[in-house]
From Swiss-Prot:
Protein name: Core protein VP3
One cellular component term from this protein's GO annotations in UniProt: virion component
Keyword match Glycosyltransferase: no
Provenance organism: African horse sickness virus
Alphabetically ordered keywords of this record: Virion
Main location group: virion
UniProt function note: The VP3 protein is one of the five proteins (with VP1, VP4, VP6 and VP7) which form the inner capsid of the virus.
Length: 905
């Protein structure tokens, strides 16, 4: 008993380290496992090629990313909404009380909050500037992308009026400083803000007016218009497309999720649109490997490797006691783990023709078993396709298989089987047979006709009926098998054949290989089931936006043979001779479809929408670079790309860089991608487009290029009449209403400033201009603006701040100077407060205080208004949905396997 236990423990250890050395046991593979396996093999191949190259190539060493984690992250993005539902619009204006009872200061809080976004701009850091722009855009979209529901109202004399909390103006803190008559005027104005009943299509809504900053209102208006379009057309188009996709993929529609969109109390929103514009996904630079791996992980079904009936061997190639033919010699072999990995590669190549192709693994020790090699030469001609449209193997492997088949036919030469050699001496250039000789040239590879392999004599790529995806209209028909046929493993494949298989049987019979011909004849049903399943997987499960477009698919083989480099060059994986035999005696049998298959359309749509948004960002940043060259002096097109990637969601960025392709993206790729016109329409894209339209006016982002230097005395008024001084609400700001006359402005470029600094006259020139009461502008670059309020004298670092940084130092006895124009400008507001005990000269100092910086903006951020006019900004029309209405985002419902109640329009 102890001996048996030791043997059992030893067997368990062997199984732990070599899972494919336990007899007929085989593994189960699914999409995620095969995707990681394929990515590992592809990255290993890339690294090996780079190590063999004489020239230096970018290093791509790094951890292999977890594909399913990335896809789950993109799926998680579907849970994020591009809008928020609130019960009151944000306060866009706040009121600052003054000592005056007639005037108050009203501040546009949007610009105040926008000024706090980001730090100082550095003209030597373009990526930082681009990141600042994108951060401000994100803030703009988050501020304006809201939906109003259940607003606070109250009754007044039989009318429903707006609660002061929802009008967008905060003024309660200033009421105590106002006169009673002004407070009454404000109250009467509030009582007149009646909530009106309106209709959006046939949905009842509340319509009212509120104060709102123009940028926020534009974003909100676009969102509201997107919803008010009701999107019946988009919904109907999406559902019809999903039905077509379900018909193609054989996905039954379930009835467990029914939504009646015609209910009058339901407002529904579609943030993603179907069908997907797959060109957006395939326009990404260096994306073909990432899309291939994603297609594997997203759509490939779970399957297991089944072996044929063992009686086929016993009645054909192993019926004799003495095993002398090659097939019988290797029939009892068990694959190792490495060989099973090669089997995986073979089936990946069969499922992804023209994307993954195979080559024979070189053996540096020259120890290839000749028996395995010759058997692989026979089976390779009925396993693989080599032309005329698609291929599974390289030209080198096709030639090696031809040689192996030639050697097999000449193996164990029998004088009773005459052979007539041809004149060329090439592999298979001979006729074999006694009475009816067979010309073996019919099996020599020819990619133009597919001769010698499965593609000969059949139409294996067809375009029969329109596909749900416009970019993939092809239907793969290995061995001329229709993927729509019902496959019953008990009967399917009987009495079926195809041209190259018939020719193989004829050639084997002519060569006297009757046992091998009988074996292949018995294996034919198993062989046909293999390719029928592969056809089904390719044409149904693997059909997605990540499938290789037809225009690229059709030219892969031609480019590969001619040595032309294309955008989607195939990935070459190496396999051993033995793995061809093990792949032939196993077939991939799907046992369960991918769990992500029903959510795949939405994952594709979200990915494409994010790509379109990123593409728009790159386009706009490149145009911004041309508009403000002084702000980004050393900018390159690649820095726009890097800044956008830095701001992109992490799952999107990881999927784009799935194969470490970012190490190889160049400026040409970036420029070409940014100029593509294909887009994936979505709510996020629409909001981003409007945000960029707003950002065309830099002042809406609190970026200003009109910053000047002029020496001005800080006002020090006499207090002859304190009551009058208080009534006027006296304040001072360094923001000017209009730009100074052009003739009075001295424009300092970098060249002028450096020239004067090198001559040692920079400070003197600046002083002379200021003494003449002149204006100086340093460059035309954008500066971030900060807003501050003071009720006493501002600190000197603000009053004397200059819109440049001038540094001077000695380095190795040489005087060095440097300029930096990228500084943060401060727009300050000084509110004068006085008491009745103050004397007339309380605000006057013996030595005057000077302020240096002046800022010109067309936007009125702070206004002094009369007390009754604090609600004068309430002029924007807003729509709010009633509290009992249902706001439903039906985007997550748009997936295959879920039947929606289609609206009848």
């Amino acid at each position: 008993m102890q001996g048996n236990e030791r043997i059992q423990d030893k067997n368990e250890k062997e199984k732990a380290y070599a899972p494919y050395l336990d007899g007929a046991s085989v593994s189960t593979d699914n999409g995620p496992i095969l995707s990681v396996f394929a990515l590992q093999e592809i990255m290993q191949k890339i690294r090996q090629n780079q190590s063999d190259m004489a020239a230096h190539a970018p290093d791509v060493d790094g951890a292999i990313p977890e594909v399913m984690t990335i896809i789950s992250g993109i799926k998680g993005l579907l849970e994020e909404k591009d809008y928020k539902v609130i019960n009151a619009p944000p306060n866009s204006f706040r009121t600052i009380p003054m000592q005056s009872t007639e005037y108050v200061l009203q501040v546009n809080t949007f610009y105040e909050r926008m000024s706090e976004i980001g730090g100082p701009i550095d003209e030597t850091d373009p990526i930082g500037f681009y990141a600042l722009i994108l951060e401000k855009l994100k803030f703009l979209k988050s501020e304006g992308a809201f939906i109003l529901q259940g607003i606070a109202t109250k009754d007044y004399r039989g009318a429903e009026i707006a609660d002061p909390e929802i009008i967008g103006v905060s003024f309660q803190n200033a009421l105590s400083h106002l006169a009673a008559i002004d407070r009454q005027i404000i109250q009467d104005t509030l009582n007149g803000m009646i909530i009106e009943n309106g209709l959006v299509a046939d949905r009842n809504v509340d319509v009212f007016r509120a104060a709102m900053s123009d940028p926020i209102y534009r974003i909100h208006n676009v969102l509201q218009g997107y919803i008010e379009g009701i999107q019946y057309g988009e919904l109907r188009e999406s559902v019809n497309w999903l039905m077509r996709l379900g018909l193609r993929k054989r996905i039954e529609f379930a009835n467990d999720f029914l939504t009646d969109f015609r209910r009058a109390d339901t407002i529904w929103i579609i943030s993603q649109r179907l069908p997907i514009n797959a060109n957006v996904i395939w326009n990404v630079p260096r994306c073909h490997i990432a899309n291939l791996i994603t297609n594997v992980a997203l759509c490939l079904p779970t399957g297991e490797y089944l072996m044929p009936n063992p009686r086929i061997n016993s009645i054909t190639i192993t019926q004799r006691i003495t095993q002398t033919n090659p097939f019988s010699i290797i029939s009892g072999l068990t694959p190792t783990a490495v060989q099973m990995n090669d089997v995986r590669k073979i089936y990946l190549a069969l499922m992804f023709p023209n994307q993954i192709i195979l080559d024979i693994k070189p053996d540096s020790s020259h120890a290839v078993d000749p028996v395995l090699r010759m058997v692989a030469g026979v089976l390779g001609h009925v396993m693989f396709t080599y032309g005329p449209i698609m291929t599974n193997i390289t030209p080198t492997m096709a030639e090696l298989l031809d040689r192996a088949l030639s050697d097999y036919l000449l193996y164990m030469y029998n004088n009773r089987i005459p052979i007539n050699y041809g004149p060329t001496g090439q592999p298979l250039d001979f006729r074999i047979g006694a009475r009816n000789q067979y010309d073996c040239n019919a099996f020599r590879a020819d990619p133009q006709t597919g001769r010698g392999y499965n593609g000969w004599g059949v139409v294996d790529v067809q375009r029969v009926q329109p596909s749900p995806y416009d970019h993939v209209q092809r239907v793969i028909r290995y061995c001329d098998i229709d993927s729509r046929e019902i496959i019953d493993p008990r009967t399917y494949g009987m009495n079926m054949t195809y041209p190259i298989f018939r020719e193989m049987l004829r050639m084997l019979v002519a060569a006297g290989k009757d046992q091998e011909a009988a074996y292949l004849r018995q294996m034919l049903p198993f062989h046909m089931i293999r390719f029928a399943r592969i056809n089904q997987i390719i044409n149904e499960d693997l059909l997605s936006a990540f499938s290789l477009p037809d225009q690229n698919f059709d030219v892969v083989l031609h480019n590969f043979i001619q040595g032309n480099f294309g955008e989607t060059d195939p990935v070459v994986l190496e396999v051993s001779w033995a793995s061809i035999w093990f792949a032939f005696v196993r077939r991939f049998e799907p046992i369960a479809r991918s769990d992500l298959l029903e959510a795949a359309p939405l994952i594709e749509a979200r990915y494409a929408a994010e790509l379109s948004t990123m593409q728009m960002d790159v386009q706009q940043l490149r145009m911004m670079r041309a508009r403000v060259p002084d702000t980004v002096i050393n900018a390159t097109p690649s820095q726009c790309w890097k800044a956008v990637l830095k701001n992109a969601p992490e799952p999107i960025k990881n999927l784009m860089n799935l194969s470490h392709s970012f190490s190889f993206v160049n400026v040409r790729d970036i420029v070409r991608w940014s100029q593509q016109r294909d887009i994936q329409e979505s709510l996020a894209y629409v909001l981003n487009r409007e945000a960029w339209a707003i950002a065309n006016d830099f002042e809406d982002l609190m970026l200003v290029d009109h910053v000047y230097i002029q020496r001005t005395m800080l006002p020090e008024p006499r207090l002859d009449d304190i009551n009058e001084f208080r009534r006027q609400g006296f304040f001072y700001t360094n923001m000017i209403d209009g730009a100074p006359p052009i003739g009075d402005v001295t424009h300092y470029t970098y060249a002028i400033a450096n020239l004067q600094a090198n001559m040692g006259q920079f400070r003197a020139a600046i002083r002379r201009t200021l003494d003449d009461n002149g204006w100086i502008q340093f460059g035309g670059m954008l500066r971030n603006i900060k807003i501050k309020f003071f009720d006493s004298r501002p600190p000197d670092e603000i009053l004397t701040a200059m819109p440049y940084v001038y540094t001077e130092e000695e380095r190795d006895g040489v005087r060095m100077v440097a300029f930096k124009y990228a500084t943060t400008a401060t727009a300050y507001f000084l509110l004068y407060n006085v008491a009745y005990s103050n004397t007339p000269d309380t605000l006057i100092t013996v030595n005057p205080t000077f302020t240096m910086t002046k800022i010109h903006m067309r936007k009125k951020i702070v206004r002094r208004v009369r007390a009754p006019d604090v609600v004068s900004q309430v002029n924007k029309r807003l729509v709010a949905y009633k509290g009992k209405m249902r706001l439903m985002d039906v985007t997550k419902c748009l997936k295959t396997g879920v039947q929606l109640a289609r609206p009848t329009i």
